[in-house]
């Protein structure tokens, strides 16, 4: 599994890099599907809210079977944005994989 991280408008701190790798490992374990690549794009959006900026995280997960999941989250800081994007992917996948009740 490959992990790619790109930051636009800010620097990638060691703490943020650690969070991305932790969340990626957690995702791989929880999904129990073979993941080919996880791409994490981080954008700082200046002036987007009263605090002066907004952190946007886009996570693209490409599985070995060719299917993919894309999730975007916006928060006040990158750490929360990254964590929330990965949590939303886990919630979507569980909902998608659970049997439907009629």
What are these regions (language model features)?
Residues 1-102:
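N-terminal, polar/charged subdomain of small-to-medium soluble alpha/beta proteins
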